[in-house]
């Protein structure tokens, strides 16, 4: 009996050892070594073939975000995926692209959706690089970098073949993966937008590792160490899938303009800090790799616009005449053509598009396809024109970024203003990265609490906050906006000016207001200071110290101003925008100056003055406090997603984004504390704000300000899905003859 137990224990130990080695090293036993290796995808010249027929990839990127959750929560369920797959295919797309290993619900849903479908929805699957490793001290040959990529790649291959009984990871999705979805997987996009410093550091530290000779991939004599690392990773994964599953599929390595293969003019390289290259032409395939490689790039029209930069500085752009449309230089199509002409393999633009967001991070100098500040209609038009540019450049396919909005995302020019641990719980229309989706998540279970559309029905049972001088103010709020309704007897839009002071923080504010315009450095001349010498005195005083002043002054001149002490841009970016140290001479707590609310942009439209007059970056800004007139109801035929206010007779509706009012986390009603007490942005809780309203012609010049209690919703935001115009625009393009 003891011998039997000992034998059983040894067998169990061997099984456990095999399972461990299979999981950690990819060890496996091929029980059918003579089986032929097959592939339903191939490359022929610059064309992708599926089942032997030319195939244009028309795809949509799909993230993992859903309101109330971070990406690593992997909170999207099977039923949601099934619904989305149907909507995507009905749009005319034939492919989705995901970036990393997801929860098992995704693969279950993908199998369920495709198993009996004559025309399947295909998949391009990504392989993610851990953020900590990417931005750490390691080069790409470090076991924590290359080793982790290969290990995760083997796990991914097993998952796609339904052969991963259980997978558990700190950063990746987990679960039981038993569905074989490999018949519908076109290929892999390995890696991410490579960090240029990692590429350069690897090439510097590992100079002797600049070649690789594998069974399926090898490098040319011109390869860099980083490219050799990519070849090794790709070869190891192709080998694993070939030997274990006797299958192959397309392979691409992620890339973007920051590490494109070109040598740019010295001024371009210096301005955009372009110092690293990844050239996949240096990675070659052997005859054993049946599927072949394609090229993957993320390319957006607004940044980094190398060719547009050259053009605006008067530098020669080769064959510029080919890309002139109605007198406008289409630098986006010119760059796409450069990329496609350079490569010998099929080129797929695996990210393109623009966000339908109120906030902006970069303006497109040529074709108006900017990173934010775009309405949903403009987003749709940009998606179509970008797709057409990609196809005219000769690319083999495209993948739109992205399917759904992602509230957890951050943008470099607003992230200092928000609590980044709470972003999934509210909708920040100032942060453009959250709103690339053609599927929007709007606040409210079925509809928003209020729309700025001139329909006052939703205000019927809302109590008044302020009543004075024939003027009434009411307020509602949700996960995206604080919405106000002002009723004024005999209101004359365009003639009467209304003022709405708001007291958000008890730390600062002023009872009087002088409207001033702090000039950014790029608008100043000589030794002119940032503060303008003259200002417009507001003909009212406020009952309480106000931090913001809403000025309703007609269709094109209505705006929100911020008291100088509470200007977030000054506190965070003064050195880049105003060329001044914000903390050497801070504004007084009760400073009377109220200034425009601006967002910093990445690159000026015309960088010439910056290059000529300054020895450092001087940022251009975007006036985000300027209010846009229009109808903000998606059900209306004249819907404008950027509409801030609407007027109907004696009634005005205004919606104010939370971040515009310095709320860092409205889900818990947290606002910015005094910047100059903390040397930066710190939070403080509030339970409400004070708000008032008056006309410049009011008899009473001391504006009454009443208390508006505010209560957060915690980590349980409400939302409903809505397909944006971009969905229907692409559907018309892709499905109609």
Regions found by a protein language model. Give the residues of each.
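Surface-exposed, glycine/proline- and aromatic-rich loop segments on solvent-exposed faces
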Residues: 465-611, 666-698
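Aromatic-rich peripheral "rim/lid" segments of glycoside hydrolase catalytic domains that contact
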Residues: 360-369, 373-378, 389-465, 723-725, ...
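Short, well-ordered beta-strand segments enriched in hydrophobic/aromatic residues
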Residues: 454, 481-489, 650-658
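A solvent-exposed, charged loop/short amphipathic helix patch at secondary-structure junctions
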Residues: 148-154, 201-228, 309-325, 360-374
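Glycoside hydrolase catalytic-domain groove-lining segments
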Residues: 267, 272-366
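Active-site groove signature of glycoside hydrolases
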Residues: 130-135, 139-142, 152-224, 245-257
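Aromatic-lined substrate-binding rim segments of carbohydrate-active enzymes
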Residues: 77-151, 155, 233-249, 325
């Amino acid at each position: 009996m003891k011998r039997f137990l000992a034998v059983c224990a040894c067998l169990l130990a061997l099984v456990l050892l095999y399972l461990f080695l299979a999981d950690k090293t990819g060890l496996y036993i091929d029980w059918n070594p003579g089986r032929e290796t097959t592939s339903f995808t191939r490359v022929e010249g610059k064309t992708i073939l599926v089942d032997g027929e030319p195939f244009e990839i028309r795809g949509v990127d799909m993230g993992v975000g859903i309101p109330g959750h971070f990406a690593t929560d992997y909170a999207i369920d099977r039923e949601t995926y099934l619904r989305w797959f149907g909507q995507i295919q009905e749009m005319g797309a034939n492919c989705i692209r995901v970036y990393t290993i997801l929860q098992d619900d995704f693969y279950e849903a993908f199998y369920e959706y495709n198993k009996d479908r004559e025309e399947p929805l295909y998949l391009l699957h990504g392989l993610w690089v851990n953020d900590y490793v990417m931005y750490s001290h390691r080069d790409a040959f470090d076991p924590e970098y290359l080793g982790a990529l290969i290990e995760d790649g083997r796990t991914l291959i097993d998952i796609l073949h339904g052969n991963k009984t259980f997978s558990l990871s700190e950063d990746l999705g987990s679960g039981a993966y038993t569905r074989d979805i490999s018949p519908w997987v076109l290929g892999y996009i390995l890696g991410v937008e490579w960090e240029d410093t990692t590429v350069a550091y690897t090439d510097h530290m590992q100079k002797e590792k600049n070649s690789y000779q594998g069974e399926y991939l090898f490098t040319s004599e011109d390869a860099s160490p980083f490219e050799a690392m990519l070849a090794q990773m790709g070869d190891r994964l192709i080998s694993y899938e070939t030997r274990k599953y006797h299958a192959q599929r397309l392979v691409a390595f992620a890339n973007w303009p920051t590490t494109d293969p070109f040598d740019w003019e010295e001024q371009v390289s210096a301005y955009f800090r372009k110092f690293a290259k990844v050239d996949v032409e240096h990675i070659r395939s052997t005859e054993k790799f049946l599927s072949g490689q394609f090229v993957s790039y993320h390319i957006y029209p607004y940044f980094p616009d190398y060719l547009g930069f050259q053009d605006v500085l008067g530098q020669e752009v080769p064959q510029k005449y080919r890309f002139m449309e109605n007198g406008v230089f289409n630098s986006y199509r010119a760059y796409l053509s450069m990329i496609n002409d350079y490569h010998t393999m099929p080129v797929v633009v695996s990210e393109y598009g623009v966000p339908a967001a109120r906030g902006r991070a970069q303006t497109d100098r040529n074709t108006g396809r900017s990173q934010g500040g775009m309405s949903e209609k403009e987003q749709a038009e940009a998606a179509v024109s970008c797709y057409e540019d990609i196809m005219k450049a000769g690319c083999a396919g495209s993948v739109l970024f992205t399917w759904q909005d992602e509230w957890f995302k951050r943008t470099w020019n607003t992230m200092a203003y928000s609590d980044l641990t709470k972003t999934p719980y509210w909708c920040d229309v100032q942060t453009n990265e959250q709103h690339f989706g053609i599927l929007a998540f709007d606040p409210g279970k079925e509809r928003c609490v209020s729309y700025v559309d001139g329909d006052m029905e939703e205000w019927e049972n809302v109590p008044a906050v302020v009543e004075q001088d024939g003027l009434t103010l009411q307020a509602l709020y949700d996960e995206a906006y604080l919405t106000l309704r002002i009723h004024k007897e005999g209101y004359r839009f365009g003639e009467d000016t209304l003022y709405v002071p708001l007291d958000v923080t008890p730390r600062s504010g002023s009872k009087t207001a002088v409207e001033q315009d702090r000039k950014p450095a790029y608008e100043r001349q000589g030794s002119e200071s940032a503060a303008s010498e003259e200002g417009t005195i507001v003909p009212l005083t406020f009952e309480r110290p106000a931090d913001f002043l809403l000025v309703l002054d007609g269709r094109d001149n209505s705006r929100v101003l911020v008291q100088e002490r509470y200007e977030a841009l000054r506190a965070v970016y003064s050195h880049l925008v105003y060329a001044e140290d914000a903390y050497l001479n801070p504004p007084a707590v009760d400073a009377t100056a109220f200034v425009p609310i601006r967002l910093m942009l990445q690159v000026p439209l015309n960088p010439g003055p910056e290059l000529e007059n300054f020895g450092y970056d001087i940022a251009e800004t975007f006036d985000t406090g300027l209010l846009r007139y229009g109808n903000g109801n998606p059900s209306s035929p004249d819907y404008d997603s950027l509409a801030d206010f609407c007027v109907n007779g004696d009634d005005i509706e205004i919606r104010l984004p939370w971040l515009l009012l310095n709320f860092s986390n409205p889900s818990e009603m947290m606002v910015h504390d005094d910047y100059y007490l903390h040397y930066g942005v710190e939070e403080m809780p509030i339970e409400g704000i004070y708000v008032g309203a008056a006309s410049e012609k009011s008899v009473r010049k001391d504006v009454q300000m009443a208390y508006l209690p505010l209560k957060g919703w915690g980590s349980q935001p409400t939302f409903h899905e809505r397909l944006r115009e971009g969905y229907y625009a692409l559907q018309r393009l892709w499905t109609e003859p």
